[in-house]
Swiss-Prot record:
Protein name as it appears in the record: Alpha-1D adrenergic receptor
InterPro entries: ADR_fam, ADRA1D_rcpt, GPCR_Rhodpsn, GPCR_Rhodpsn_7TM
Post-translational modification: Palmitoylated. Palmitoylation by ZDHHC21 may increase the expression of the receptor and regulate downstream signaling.
GO cellular component: plasma membrane
Membrane-spanning residues: 91-115, 128-153, 164-186, 208-232, 246-269, 343-367, 375-399
Similarity comment: Belongs to the G-protein coupled receptor 1 family. Adrenergic receptor subfamily. ADRA1D sub-subfamily.
Source organism of the structure: Mus musculus (Mouse)
Chain intervals for the UniProt region annotation (Disordered): 13-44, 50-69, 444-472
Extracellular side stretches: 1-90, 154-163, 233-245, 368-374
Gene of this entry: Adra1d
Amino acid sequence: MTFRDILSVTFEGPRASSSTGGSGAGGGAGTVGPEGPAVGGVPGATGGSAVVGTGSGEDNQSSTAEAGAAASGEVNGSAAVGGLVVSAQGVGVGVFLAAFILTAVAGNLLVILSVACNRHLQTVTNYFIVNLAVADLLLSAAVLPFSATMEVLGFWPFGRTFCDVWAAVDVLCCTASILSLCTISVDRYVGVRHSLKYPAIMTERKAAAILALLWAVALVVSVGPLLGWKEPVPPDERFCGITEEVGYAIFSSVCSFYLPMAVIVVMYCRVYVVARSTTRSLEAGIKREPGKASEVVLRIHCRGAATSAKGNPGTQSSKGHTLRSSLSVRLLKFSREKKAAKTLAIVVGVFVLCWFPFFFVLPLGSLFPQLKPSEGVFKVIFWLGYFNSCVNPLIYPCSSREFKRAFLRLLRCQCRRRRRRLWPSLRPPLASLDRRPALRLCPQPAHRTPRGSPSPHCTPRPGLRRHAGGAGFGLRPSKASLRLREWRLLGPLQRPTTQLRAKVSSLSHKFRSGGARRAETACALRSEVEAVSLNVPQDGAEAVICQAYEPGDLSNLRETDI
Protein backbone atom coordinates (compact mmCIF):
# COMPACT_ATOMS: atom_id res chain seq x y z
CA MET A 1 0.00 0.00 0.00
CA THR A 2 1.43 3.36 -1.01
CA PHE A 3 1.40 6.61 0.93
CA ARG A 4 -1.32 7.91 -1.35
CA ASP A 5 -3.55 4.96 -0.44
CA ILE A 6 -3.10 5.73 3.24
CA LEU A 7 -4.25 9.30 2.83
CA SER A 8 -7.33 8.42 0.74
CA VAL A 9 -10.56 6.50 1.41
CA THR A 10 -11.95 4.37 -1.40
CA PHE A 11 -15.68 4.03 -2.00
CA GLU A 12 -17.12 1.29 -4.18
CA GLY A 13 -20.48 -0.35 -4.92
CA PRO A 14 -24.09 0.76 -4.38
CA ARG A 15 -25.67 1.87 -1.14
CA ALA A 16 -25.97 -0.97 1.29
CA SER A 17 -24.91 -2.02 4.72
CA SER A 18 -21.17 -2.29 5.10
CA SER A 19 -18.65 -3.53 7.57
CA THR A 20 -15.69 -1.58 8.81
CA GLY A 21 -12.04 -2.44 8.70
CA GLY A 22 -9.25 -1.23 10.84
CA SER A 23 -10.86 -2.28 14.11
CA GLY A 24 -8.80 -3.30 17.08
CA ALA A 25 -5.22 -2.15 17.52
CA GLY A 26 -4.62 -1.00 14.02
CA GLY A 27 -6.98 -3.40 12.24
CA GLY A 28 -6.38 -5.45 9.17
CA ALA A 29 -6.82 -4.83 5.50
CA GLY A 30 -10.60 -4.40 5.73
CA THR A 31 -13.44 -6.50 4.42
CA VAL A 32 -16.11 -5.99 1.86
CA GLY A 33 -19.82 -5.98 2.78
CA PRO A 34 -22.36 -7.84 0.78
CA GLU A 35 -23.04 -4.87 -1.45
CA GLY A 36 -20.97 -2.16 0.23
CA PRO A 37 -17.55 -0.56 -0.18
CA ALA A 38 -14.17 -1.89 0.74
CA VAL A 39 -12.74 -0.24 3.80
CA GLY A 40 -9.06 0.53 4.00
CA GLY A 41 -7.16 -0.21 7.14
CA VAL A 42 -3.64 0.17 8.30
CA PRO A 43 -1.48 -2.73 9.50
CA GLY A 44 -1.23 -3.39 13.19
CA ALA A 45 2.23 -1.89 13.33
CA THR A 46 0.79 1.57 12.89
CA GLY A 47 -1.31 1.24 16.05
CA GLY A 48 -3.41 4.29 16.73
CA SER A 49 -2.80 5.77 13.28
CA ALA A 50 -5.46 3.61 11.63
CA VAL A 51 -7.71 5.09 8.99
CA VAL A 52 -11.35 4.21 9.34
CA GLY A 53 -13.38 3.67 6.17
CA THR A 54 -17.08 4.34 6.10
CA GLY A 55 -19.92 3.09 3.97
CA SER A 56 -23.25 4.60 3.14
CA GLY A 57 -25.74 1.93 4.26
CA GLU A 58 -28.27 2.13 7.04
CA ASP A 59 -26.19 -0.13 9.25
CA ASN A 60 -23.27 2.25 9.05
CA GLN A 61 -24.77 5.18 10.96
CA SER A 62 -22.74 4.54 14.08
CA SER A 63 -19.98 2.40 12.63
CA THR A 64 -17.58 5.32 12.19
CA ALA A 65 -17.41 6.28 15.84
CA GLU A 66 -17.33 2.69 17.05
CA ALA A 67 -14.62 1.66 14.63
CA GLY A 68 -12.62 4.81 15.34
CA ALA A 69 -12.72 4.13 19.05
CA ALA A 70 -11.72 0.53 18.48
CA ALA A 71 -8.97 1.44 16.06
CA SER A 72 -7.17 3.71 18.47
CA GLY A 73 -7.41 4.00 22.18
CA GLU A 74 -5.64 7.38 22.00
CA VAL A 75 -7.94 9.20 19.63
CA ASN A 76 -8.81 11.66 22.40
CA GLY A 77 -6.06 14.28 22.41
CA SER A 78 -4.93 13.38 18.87
CA ALA A 79 -4.92 15.44 15.69
CA ALA A 80 -5.99 14.25 12.25
CA VAL A 81 -3.63 15.48 9.56
CA GLY A 82 -4.42 14.52 5.98
CA GLY A 83 -6.46 11.53 7.11
CA LEU A 84 -3.76 10.39 9.55
CA VAL A 85 -4.25 10.41 13.29
CA VAL A 86 -1.23 12.00 14.98
CA SER A 87 -0.98 11.95 18.75
CA ALA A 88 -0.20 15.01 20.81
CA GLN A 89 3.18 13.51 21.63
CA GLY A 90 3.92 13.20 17.92
CA VAL A 91 3.02 16.84 17.38
CA GLY A 92 5.40 17.90 20.15
CA VAL A 93 8.19 15.77 18.72
CA GLY A 94 7.56 17.26 15.29
CA VAL A 95 7.81 20.83 16.58
CA PHE A 96 11.04 20.07 18.44
CA LEU A 97 12.64 18.34 15.45
CA ALA A 98 11.57 21.16 13.13
CA ALA A 99 13.30 23.72 15.36
CA PHE A 100 16.34 21.45 15.54
CA ILE A 101 16.55 21.17 11.73
CA LEU A 102 16.07 24.91 11.17
CA THR A 103 18.83 25.69 13.67
CA ALA A 104 21.24 23.33 11.93
CA VAL A 105 20.44 24.77 8.50
CA ALA A 106 20.76 28.39 9.66
CA GLY A 107 24.03 27.81 11.52
CA ASN A 108 25.75 26.07 8.63
CA LEU A 109 24.48 28.65 6.15
CA LEU A 110 25.98 31.39 8.31
CA VAL A 111 29.37 29.68 8.20
CA ILE A 112 29.31 29.33 4.41
CA LEU A 113 28.12 32.89 3.79
CA SER A 114 30.64 34.33 6.26
CA VAL A 115 33.55 32.92 4.29
CA ALA A 116 31.97 33.78 0.94
CA CYS A 117 31.31 37.42 1.87
CA ASN A 118 34.61 38.13 3.66
CA ARG A 119 37.80 37.76 1.67
CA HIS A 120 39.99 37.86 4.74
CA LEU A 121 38.32 34.63 5.92
CA GLN A 122 39.11 32.77 2.71
CA THR A 123 42.02 30.75 4.04
CA VAL A 124 42.89 27.08 3.69
CA THR A 125 41.84 26.32 7.26
CA ASN A 126 38.50 27.99 6.71
CA TYR A 127 38.01 26.03 3.50
CA PHE A 128 38.00 22.88 5.60
CA ILE A 129 35.49 24.47 7.97
CA VAL A 130 33.30 25.39 4.99
CA ASN A 131 33.48 21.80 3.78
CA LEU A 132 32.30 20.69 7.22
CA ALA A 133 29.43 23.16 6.99
CA VAL A 134 28.49 21.91 3.51
CA ALA A 135 28.33 18.31 4.73
CA ASP A 136 26.24 19.30 7.74
CA LEU A 137 23.98 21.51 5.61
CA LEU A 138 23.38 18.68 3.14
CA LEU A 139 22.56 16.38 6.04
CA SER A 140 20.21 18.92 7.61
CA ALA A 141 18.37 19.74 4.39
CA ALA A 142 18.27 16.39 2.55
CA VAL A 143 18.17 13.79 5.34
CA LEU A 144 16.78 15.15 8.58
CA PRO A 145 13.35 16.26 7.26
CA PHE A 146 12.54 12.70 6.16
CA SER A 147 13.91 11.27 9.40
CA ALA A 148 11.68 13.65 11.36
CA THR A 149 8.66 12.66 9.26
CA MET A 150 9.27 9.01 10.06
CA GLU A 151 9.55 9.81 13.76
CA VAL A 152 6.27 11.73 13.80
CA LEU A 153 4.21 9.26 11.74
CA GLY A 154 5.76 6.12 13.17
CA PHE A 155 6.42 4.55 9.75
CA TRP A 156 8.18 5.29 6.45
CA PRO A 157 5.66 6.64 3.92
CA PHE A 158 7.96 7.25 0.93
CA GLY A 159 8.51 3.79 -0.56
CA ARG A 160 11.35 1.29 -0.68
CA THR A 161 13.46 2.89 -3.42
CA PHE A 162 13.60 6.27 -1.76
CA CYS A 163 14.40 4.56 1.53
CA ASP A 164 17.58 3.07 0.05
CA VAL A 165 18.63 6.42 -1.41
CA TRP A 166 17.88 8.23 1.85
CA ALA A 167 19.97 5.77 3.86
CA ALA A 168 22.91 6.12 1.44
CA VAL A 169 22.82 9.93 1.56
CA ASP A 170 22.62 9.74 5.35
CA VAL A 171 25.80 7.67 5.57
CA LEU A 172 27.50 9.89 2.97
CA CYS A 173 26.85 13.14 4.83
CA CYS A 174 27.66 11.78 8.29
CA THR A 175 30.91 10.23 7.07
CA ALA A 176 31.92 13.42 5.24
CA SER A 177 31.18 15.47 8.36
CA ILE A 178 33.30 13.25 10.60
CA LEU A 179 36.15 13.13 8.08
CA SER A 180 36.02 16.93 7.86
CA LEU A 181 36.52 17.13 11.62
CA CYS A 182 39.49 14.80 11.21
CA THR A 183 40.95 16.97 8.44
CA ILE A 184 40.57 20.12 10.53
CA SER A 185 42.48 18.51 13.39
CA VAL A 186 45.37 17.55 11.09
CA ASP A 187 45.41 21.01 9.50
CA ARG A 188 45.58 22.74 12.87
CA TYR A 189 48.35 20.48 14.07
CA VAL A 190 50.39 21.30 10.97
CA GLY A 191 49.66 24.99 11.44
CA VAL A 192 50.87 24.93 15.04
CA ARG A 193 53.79 22.51 14.64
CA HIS A 194 55.20 23.78 11.34
CA SER A 195 53.62 27.18 11.03
CA LEU A 196 56.57 28.88 9.32
CA LYS A 197 56.29 26.26 6.58
CA TYR A 198 52.51 26.03 6.71
CA PRO A 199 51.81 28.21 3.64
CA ALA A 200 54.10 25.98 1.58
CA ILE A 201 52.81 22.73 3.07
CA MET A 202 49.08 23.39 2.91
CA THR A 203 48.42 25.10 -0.40
CA GLU A 204 45.01 25.58 -1.95
CA ARG A 205 45.72 22.86 -4.51
CA LYS A 206 46.59 20.38 -1.78
CA ALA A 207 43.51 21.39 0.17
CA ALA A 208 41.31 20.75 -2.88
CA ALA A 209 42.90 17.33 -3.35
CA ILE A 210 42.32 16.49 0.32
CA LEU A 211 38.67 17.50 0.10
CA ALA A 212 38.17 15.44 -3.06
CA LEU A 213 39.72 12.41 -1.36
CA LEU A 214 37.52 13.00 1.68
CA TRP A 215 34.30 12.89 -0.33
CA ALA A 216 35.55 9.90 -2.32
CA VAL A 217 36.09 7.91 0.89
CA ALA A 218 32.66 8.93 2.16
CA LEU A 219 31.10 7.85 -1.14
CA VAL A 220 32.79 4.44 -1.00
CA VAL A 221 31.47 3.86 2.51
CA SER A 222 27.93 4.92 1.61
CA VAL A 223 27.34 2.99 -1.64
CA GLY A 224 27.76 -0.44 -0.07
CA PRO A 225 24.05 -1.02 0.68
CA LEU A 226 23.07 0.26 -2.77
CA LEU A 227 25.27 -2.43 -4.32
CA GLY A 228 23.68 -5.19 -2.26
CA TRP A 229 25.85 -5.22 0.86
CA LYS A 230 22.93 -5.26 3.27
CA GLU A 231 20.54 -7.54 5.07
CA PRO A 232 17.46 -9.00 3.30
CA VAL A 233 14.85 -6.43 2.37
CA PRO A 234 11.86 -6.49 4.76
CA PRO A 235 8.52 -7.23 3.08
CA ASP A 236 6.83 -4.19 4.56
CA GLU A 237 7.69 -1.06 2.58
CA ARG A 238 6.62 1.12 5.47
CA PHE A 239 9.70 0.05 7.41
CA CYS A 240 12.99 1.84 6.67
CA GLY A 241 16.09 1.65 8.79
CA ILE A 242 19.84 1.54 8.66
CA THR A 243 21.59 -1.59 7.45
CA GLU A 244 22.59 -3.90 10.29
CA GLU A 245 24.45 -6.49 8.23
CA VAL A 246 27.43 -7.54 10.36
CA GLY A 247 30.20 -6.99 7.81
CA TYR A 248 28.95 -3.62 6.65
CA ALA A 249 28.21 -2.43 10.19
CA ILE A 250 31.80 -3.11 11.26
CA PHE A 251 33.28 -1.67 8.05
CA SER A 252 31.28 1.55 8.21
CA SER A 253 31.90 2.01 11.94
CA VAL A 254 35.67 1.67 11.55
CA CYS A 255 35.97 3.90 8.46
CA SER A 256 33.41 6.50 9.49
CA PHE A 257 34.20 6.85 13.19
CA TYR A 258 36.91 4.85 14.92
CA LEU A 259 39.81 5.73 12.62
CA PRO A 260 38.86 9.44 12.40
CA MET A 261 38.32 9.55 16.17
CA ALA A 262 41.80 8.15 16.78
CA VAL A 263 43.33 10.76 14.47
CA ILE A 264 41.35 13.60 16.09
CA VAL A 265 42.34 12.64 19.63
CA VAL A 266 46.03 12.19 18.73
CA MET A 267 46.22 15.44 16.73
CA TYR A 268 44.59 17.59 19.38
CA CYS A 269 46.74 16.07 22.11
CA ARG A 270 49.79 16.95 20.03
CA VAL A 271 48.43 20.46 19.46
CA TYR A 272 48.09 20.93 23.20
CA VAL A 273 51.62 19.68 23.87
CA VAL A 274 53.15 21.90 21.18
CA ALA A 275 51.14 24.91 22.32
CA ARG A 276 52.25 24.46 25.92
CA SER A 277 55.92 24.11 24.98
CA THR A 278 55.67 27.13 22.68
CA THR A 279 54.19 29.22 25.45
CA ARG A 280 57.04 28.34 27.76
CA SER A 281 59.57 29.18 25.05
CA LEU A 282 57.96 32.55 24.45
CA GLU A 283 58.08 33.35 28.15
CA ALA A 284 61.82 32.76 27.95
CA GLY A 285 62.05 35.00 24.88
CA ILE A 286 63.35 32.35 22.49
CA LYS A 287 61.55 29.96 20.18
CA ARG A 288 63.65 27.08 18.82
CA GLU A 289 62.63 25.30 15.67
CA PRO A 290 63.06 21.51 15.91
CA GLY A 291 66.03 20.07 14.09
CA LYS A 292 67.63 23.46 13.41
CA ALA A 293 70.37 25.37 15.14
CA SER A 294 68.88 28.77 14.48
CA GLU A 295 66.90 30.69 17.04
CA VAL A 296 63.89 32.87 16.46
CA VAL A 297 63.79 35.75 18.93
CA LEU A 298 60.74 37.98 19.11
CA ARG A 299 61.66 41.57 19.81
CA ILE A 300 59.42 44.59 20.27
CA HIS A 301 60.99 47.80 18.96
CA CYS A 302 59.78 50.86 20.84
CA ARG A 303 60.02 54.32 19.37
CA GLY A 304 61.37 56.99 21.69
CA ALA A 305 64.30 57.70 23.91
CA ALA A 306 65.41 54.50 25.58
CA THR A 307 66.88 56.07 28.68
CA SER A 308 66.74 54.87 32.22
CA ALA A 309 65.52 57.05 35.04
CA LYS A 310 68.74 56.49 36.96
CA GLY A 311 70.95 56.09 33.93
CA ASN A 312 72.14 52.65 35.00
CA PRO A 313 72.87 50.57 31.87
CA GLY A 314 72.73 47.27 33.73
CA THR A 315 69.35 48.00 35.24
CA GLN A 316 68.10 49.17 31.86
CA SER A 317 69.25 45.95 30.21
CA SER A 318 67.66 43.65 32.78
CA LYS A 319 64.38 45.54 32.84
CA GLY A 320 64.35 45.68 29.06
CA HIS A 321 64.70 41.90 28.88
CA THR A 322 61.81 41.47 31.32
CA LEU A 323 59.71 43.88 29.28
CA ARG A 324 60.53 42.01 26.08
CA SER A 325 59.44 38.70 27.53
CA SER A 326 56.19 40.07 28.93
CA LEU A 327 55.36 41.84 25.69
CA SER A 328 56.04 38.69 23.72
CA VAL A 329 53.55 36.78 25.79
CA ARG A 330 50.94 39.54 25.51
CA LEU A 331 51.44 39.90 21.76
CA LEU A 332 51.27 36.24 20.86
CA LYS A 333 48.88 34.80 23.44
CA PHE A 334 49.67 31.63 21.61
CA SER A 335 48.39 29.03 23.96
CA ARG A 336 47.45 29.58 27.54
CA GLU A 337 47.24 26.15 29.03
CA LYS A 338 43.86 26.60 30.66
CA LYS A 339 42.26 28.00 27.54
CA ALA A 340 43.77 25.29 25.36
CA ALA A 341 42.62 22.56 27.70
CA LYS A 342 39.10 23.98 27.80
CA THR A 343 38.85 24.30 24.03
CA LEU A 344 40.19 20.82 23.42
CA ALA A 345 37.81 19.36 25.96
CA ILE A 346 34.87 20.95 24.13
CA VAL A 347 35.99 19.87 20.66
CA VAL A 348 36.87 16.27 21.45
CA GLY A 349 34.23 15.84 24.15
CA VAL A 350 31.28 16.95 22.00
CA PHE A 351 32.42 14.82 19.07
CA VAL A 352 32.81 11.67 21.15
CA LEU A 353 29.61 12.31 23.10
CA CYS A 354 27.54 12.70 19.93
CA TRP A 355 28.87 9.85 17.80
CA PHE A 356 30.36 7.21 20.10
CA PRO A 357 27.03 5.82 21.43
CA PHE A 358 25.69 5.20 17.92
CA PHE A 359 28.85 3.60 16.54
CA PHE A 360 29.15 1.49 19.67
CA VAL A 361 25.57 0.20 19.56
CA LEU A 362 25.50 -0.41 15.78
CA PRO A 363 28.19 -3.11 15.50
CA LEU A 364 27.36 -4.51 18.93
CA GLY A 365 23.72 -5.01 17.98
CA SER A 366 24.74 -6.58 14.67
CA LEU A 367 27.03 -9.11 16.34
CA PHE A 368 24.80 -9.79 19.34
CA PRO A 369 21.11 -9.14 18.54
CA GLN A 370 20.11 -9.91 22.12
CA LEU A 371 22.11 -6.85 23.27
CA LYS A 372 20.20 -4.38 21.13
CA PRO A 373 18.76 -1.46 23.11
CA SER A 374 15.08 -0.69 23.16
CA GLU A 375 13.51 1.24 20.31
CA GLY A 376 13.20 4.44 22.34
CA VAL A 377 16.83 4.35 23.48
CA PHE A 378 18.04 3.69 19.96
CA LYS A 379 16.10 6.68 18.62
CA VAL A 380 17.77 8.95 21.17
CA ILE A 381 21.20 7.57 20.23
CA PHE A 382 20.37 7.90 16.54
CA TRP A 383 19.45 11.59 16.81
CA LEU A 384 22.37 12.34 19.10
CA GLY A 385 24.68 11.83 16.14
CA TYR A 386 22.61 14.28 14.12
CA PHE A 387 22.98 16.77 16.96
CA ASN A 388 26.69 17.04 16.18
CA SER A 389 25.84 18.67 12.85
CA CYS A 390 23.90 21.33 14.73
CA VAL A 391 26.65 22.23 17.21
CA ASN A 392 29.58 22.18 14.76
CA PRO A 393 28.87 25.76 13.61
CA LEU A 394 28.96 26.84 17.25
CA ILE A 395 32.19 25.09 18.21
CA TYR A 396 34.57 25.62 15.31
CA PRO A 397 33.77 28.99 13.71
CA CYS A 398 32.58 30.68 16.90
CA SER A 399 35.95 29.99 18.53
CA SER A 400 37.29 32.71 16.20
CA ARG A 401 36.55 36.38 16.77
CA GLU A 402 36.65 36.99 13.04
CA PHE A 403 33.83 34.51 12.48
CA LYS A 404 31.82 36.10 15.26
CA ARG A 405 32.14 39.51 13.65
CA ALA A 406 31.24 38.03 10.27
CA PHE A 407 28.13 36.43 11.77
CA LEU A 408 27.04 39.76 13.22
CA ARG A 409 27.58 41.53 9.91
CA LEU A 410 25.48 38.92 8.11
CA LEU A 411 22.70 39.18 10.67
CA ARG A 412 22.76 42.95 10.18
CA CYS A 413 22.67 42.49 6.39
CA GLN A 414 26.18 43.91 6.02
CA CYS A 415 27.79 41.49 3.64
CA ARG A 416 30.58 43.79 2.53
CA ARG A 417 33.34 44.37 5.00
CA ARG A 418 33.67 47.96 6.08
CA ARG A 419 36.90 49.68 5.23
CA ARG A 420 38.41 50.47 8.58
CA ARG A 421 41.66 52.19 9.26
CA LEU A 422 44.31 49.72 10.25
CA TRP A 423 45.16 49.82 13.94
CA PRO A 424 43.58 53.12 15.01
CA SER A 425 45.09 52.71 18.47
CA LEU A 426 48.55 53.07 16.93
CA ARG A 427 48.00 56.55 15.48
CA PRO A 428 51.28 58.45 15.85
CA PRO A 429 51.15 61.01 18.65
CA LEU A 430 53.79 63.22 17.04
CA ALA A 431 53.10 65.60 14.20
CA SER A 432 56.28 64.42 12.46
CA LEU A 433 54.67 61.09 11.58
CA ASP A 434 52.73 61.30 8.35
CA ARG A 435 51.42 57.75 8.49
CA ARG A 436 50.88 55.06 11.06
CA PRO A 437 53.82 52.85 12.06
CA ALA A 438 54.40 49.71 10.11
CA LEU A 439 54.47 46.20 11.47
CA ARG A 440 57.52 44.64 9.84
CA LEU A 441 58.60 41.05 10.08
CA CYS A 442 62.18 40.86 8.89
CA PRO A 443 64.79 38.12 9.28
CA GLN A 444 67.92 39.69 10.73
CA PRO A 445 71.45 38.51 11.52
CA ALA A 446 72.43 37.37 14.97
CA HIS A 447 73.86 40.70 16.10
CA ARG A 448 71.51 43.11 17.73
CA THR A 449 70.83 46.70 16.85
CA PRO A 450 69.97 49.43 19.36
CA ARG A 451 66.33 49.61 20.22
CA GLY A 452 64.40 52.23 18.37
CA SER A 453 66.75 52.14 15.35
CA PRO A 454 65.99 50.37 12.10
CA SER A 455 67.95 47.30 11.14
CA PRO A 456 70.66 47.95 8.52
CA HIS A 457 69.64 44.76 6.73
CA CYS A 458 66.00 45.64 6.26
CA THR A 459 64.55 48.02 3.74
CA PRO A 460 61.07 49.47 3.90
CA ARG A 461 58.34 48.06 1.72
CA PRO A 462 57.63 49.80 -1.60
CA GLY A 463 55.34 52.75 -1.26
CA LEU A 464 56.66 53.71 2.20
CA ARG A 465 59.87 55.58 2.95
CA ARG A 466 61.39 56.45 6.27
CA HIS A 467 62.50 59.88 7.44
CA ALA A 468 63.85 61.27 10.65
CA GLY A 469 61.82 63.74 12.55
CA GLY A 470 60.68 64.54 16.06
CA ALA A 471 61.61 61.92 18.60
CA GLY A 472 61.89 58.97 16.25
CA PHE A 473 61.45 57.62 12.79
CA GLY A 474 58.26 58.20 10.85
CA LEU A 475 56.72 56.97 7.65
CA ARG A 476 56.02 59.25 4.72
CA PRO A 477 53.82 57.81 1.99
CA SER A 478 55.02 57.95 -1.58
CA LYS A 479 52.96 59.42 -4.38
CA ALA A 480 52.03 55.97 -5.64
CA SER A 481 50.52 54.94 -2.32
CA LEU A 482 48.60 58.20 -2.09
CA ARG A 483 47.13 57.64 -5.50
CA LEU A 484 45.92 54.22 -4.44
CA ARG A 485 44.12 55.87 -1.47
CA GLU A 486 44.83 52.78 0.55
CA TRP A 487 47.86 52.08 2.67
CA ARG A 488 48.73 48.47 1.98
CA LEU A 489 50.83 47.11 4.79
CA LEU A 490 51.32 43.59 3.49
CA GLY A 491 50.86 43.88 -0.26
CA PRO A 492 47.76 43.71 -2.45
CA LEU A 493 46.86 40.13 -1.57
CA GLN A 494 47.83 40.08 2.09
CA ARG A 495 45.94 41.63 4.98
CA PRO A 496 46.69 41.57 8.70
CA THR A 497 44.39 39.41 10.75
CA THR A 498 41.93 40.86 13.19
CA GLN A 499 43.52 38.97 16.07
CA LEU A 500 46.93 40.49 15.37
CA ARG A 501 45.51 44.01 15.20
CA ALA A 502 43.78 43.48 18.53
CA LYS A 503 47.00 42.19 20.09
CA VAL A 504 49.10 45.11 18.90
CA SER A 505 46.37 47.48 20.06
CA SER A 506 46.46 45.88 23.49
CA LEU A 507 50.22 46.37 23.63
CA SER A 508 49.88 50.02 22.69
CA HIS A 509 47.40 50.60 25.51
CA LYS A 510 49.77 48.89 27.92
CA PHE A 511 52.54 51.30 27.01
CA ARG A 512 50.29 54.32 27.46
CA SER A 513 48.40 53.31 30.60
CA GLY A 514 49.00 50.75 33.31
CA GLY A 515 52.27 49.46 31.95
CA ALA A 516 53.91 52.86 31.62
CA ARG A 517 55.81 52.51 34.89
CA ARG A 518 57.47 49.31 33.75
CA ALA A 519 57.98 50.51 30.21
CA GLU A 520 59.46 53.96 30.93
CA THR A 521 63.00 52.54 31.24
CA ALA A 522 62.84 51.02 27.78
CA CYS A 523 60.58 53.39 25.83
CA ALA A 524 59.64 57.02 25.94
CA LEU A 525 56.44 58.00 27.66
CA ARG A 526 54.68 58.43 24.32
CA SER A 527 56.39 55.51 22.59
CA GLU A 528 54.49 52.97 20.58
CA VAL A 529 55.11 49.59 19.07
CA GLU A 530 56.96 50.23 15.82
CA ALA A 531 57.88 46.79 14.58
CA VAL A 532 57.96 43.14 15.37
CA SER A 533 61.05 41.52 13.93
CA LEU A 534 62.57 38.07 13.87
CA ASN A 535 66.22 37.72 14.81
CA VAL A 536 67.53 34.68 12.90
CA PRO A 537 71.24 33.86 13.38
CA GLN A 538 73.04 33.18 10.10
CA ASP A 539 76.33 31.28 10.41
CA GLY A 540 78.70 32.59 7.75
CA ALA A 541 75.90 33.71 5.49
CA GLU A 542 75.38 37.12 4.00
CA ALA A 543 72.81 39.50 5.29
CA VAL A 544 69.31 38.37 4.57
CA ILE A 545 67.25 40.63 2.36
CA CYS A 546 64.20 41.92 4.12
CA GLN A 547 61.08 39.91 3.36
CA ALA A 548 57.52 40.57 4.39
CA TYR A 549 55.45 37.75 5.79
CA GLU A 550 51.75 37.35 6.40
CA PRO A 551 51.30 37.73 10.18
CA GLY A 552 48.45 35.24 10.22
CA ASP A 553 50.69 32.58 8.68
CA LEU A 554 53.67 33.04 10.97
CA SER A 555 54.30 30.66 13.80
CA ASN A 556 52.82 31.80 17.03
CA LEU A 557 51.72 35.19 15.73
CA ARG A 558 48.08 34.21 15.86
CA GLU A 559 45.90 32.79 18.55
CA THR A 560 45.90 29.04 18.76
CA ASP A 561 43.58 27.43 16.24
CA ILE A 562 42.27 24.69 18.52
